[in-house]
Amino acid sequence: MTLNPWAVKARALDRYRWRLLRERHSLLGSALRFAREALGDWWFGLRAKYRLAASVDIESCDFLLLQSAPKVIAFQRKKLLIEGVRGRGYHLLETALRPPRTILRERLLKRPRHAVPTRYFGMAAHAEWLVQHHQPRVLLNDRNGSLYAPFLRLALAASGGLLVHLAHATTVERSRRLGMNDYDYYFLFGQSSLEALQARMLRFGSSTAVLVGSHMIDDSYVMPAPDLATRTLLILGVGPDKEKESAYQQTYALLASWARRHPEYRVLVKPHPRSQAPFWLGVVQATANVELLGADCSLAAALKRASVVVNILSNAVIEAALAGRPVLCVDLGGQQDIFQQQRFFGPVIRAEDELEQRLLGIEADFGQALEQSRAFAEFHLAHGAGGLASTLDALQRLHDGNSLSAELRTVTLEAHPANL
């Protein structure tokens, strides 16, 4: 008897989602949440059965970039990648996952090739519609943890296509979404991401992890070593949710106090892209040597002006290290050191006098500080500033049916436990 791979996948998803809930909730709490999620999925699936498209118009492409939501497209986070793929002569279309109500209203649904339990019928039918509508050779998935991914992979396999998941950051955080691993290829930034995924106790599906580097970084981060004589500190701000917390207000206050006591230093503040920087707006009005950088100032441009970077809790510390800037971590929030900054840059700074001593240490042994940044960047970013070119080359090879370059490290990431 031939097994139905779609139904097998659906049953495995049930097991996976139950285990995800049990990681955070009691047996009763997990059961209630599981039932609530199942009811919502079942209702979507039931309605989807009556909203199937009578026919599917074809809008084919070589690459289909599937973003997590329509609003994400406007952020243009994949601009370099899109331009690179199109620059190589391929037809790339960019679209986004729609909410269930839109999928139902617009009949973006096609009956899956095999029977699927009602709970997952809506997801499977939309995945089938996407593949039949666009007929991509390679589908580039952006959303971590998407429950559509397993069905996209099945639909693509039936038509000779591939599902490639593009990590849009290092995968070192503890987000439950990173348990999804059901892709043909999983493009990772570097060694730290691979180690973090291998250490996870819950992985759904299998994939071939490829250390391609970051497709979001170009050679703008290749710059001369900083001039310590400029005495310019760049502070990387935290996200708008975190910066409201008292511990991060205290961290900001520590840095602002230090800046007031050291007018010989120029202090630049690069806010998080989503932050309005309310704390620093007040500081710059009262402190002449503090400058709040505007949204039009790129991270690379900010790093060019900096001699030392102060990081609190920002992914941008990786770009700072790649740019060859010494890094100091200042944090009163007590967050887990997910980037392993202490391993490379020393203990977290929690007082003004510590910051002063560490700056003196950088001035005393500048070569060591640069070596620490180089090692940190290599740990997190394969191929350094060449990540975009590496990613484009890998995508071209996959599209053309060729093997990946021997220079790329590939590792099989199996499901864990094995029944997922």
Describe every region a protein language model picked out.
Residues M1-L21, A35-S60, L64-I217:
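Active-site and donor-binding regions of nucleotide-sugar-utilizing enzymes
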Residues T102-L104, E173-L178, A196-R200, D219-M223, ...:
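Short, charged, surface-exposed secondary-structure boundary motifs
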Residues H126, R274-A323, V327:
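Donor nucleotide-activated moiety binding/catalytic core segment of transferases
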Residues H134, A158-S159, A229, H262-P263, ...:
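Helix C-cap/helix->beta junction micro-motif
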